[in-house]
A protein has these predicted regions:
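Metal-dependent phosphodiester-processing active-site neighborhood
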Residues: 1, 20, 32
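A short, polar/acidic, helix/strand-boundary loop motif
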Residues: 31-48
Length: 154
């Protein structure tokens, strides 16, 4: 059986850092599209960028899909593509910001074949621009969620 080929577009936003934040994600497989967004009262831009990726990957129902993640976050893309997150994991995420989210990321990352593509933010990439609008709108909602993993050190 052929693997599903999925495109996952993501972005995070934060007004102040820390401050209210949100993420947006678009998951596409052929003509299927699912859109995700959520806002948090106090968080960071890096947490929202990473949570966008996690949320999209967790939504994939196909086993062992081929996933291309499009992100403007050097933090997320470099951590994976340069292998940093795997060395952080080997060291038990000691003193690493966002360890809760990186552990959650690795659990879902390993279910699929995932590659990351960095895109320049605010540069006219249609899906990145759409995810940015989703993230900003989510961060401005009235009833923002609590980012339970956020700490001032993160």
């Amino acid at each position: 059986m052929d693997r599903a080929h999925i495109q996952l577009y993501t972005d995070g936003a934060c007004s102040g850092n820390p401050g209210p934040g949100g993420y947006g994600a678009i998951l596409r497989c052929g003509s299927y599209e699912k859109v995700f967004s959520a806002g948090y009262a106090t968080t960071t831009n890096n947490r929202m960028e990473l949570l966008a990726v996690i949320t999209g990957l967790e939504a994939i129902r196909w086993a062992q899909a081929d996933v291309t993640v499009w992100s403007d976050s050097s933090y997320v893309v470099d951590a994976v593509e340069k292998g940093w997150v795997f060395s952080w994991e080997q060291k038990g995420f000691a003193k690493k910001a966002n360890a809760d989210l990186w552990q959650r990321f690795l659990a879902v990352y390993r279910r699929h074949q995932v590659r990351f593509v960095w895109v320049r933010g605010h540069n006219g990439h249609p899906e990145n621009e759409r995810c940015d609008r989703l993230a900003v709108a989510a961060s401005q909602e009235k009833n923002l969620l609590v980012d339970v993993g956020y700490t001032k050190e993160a």
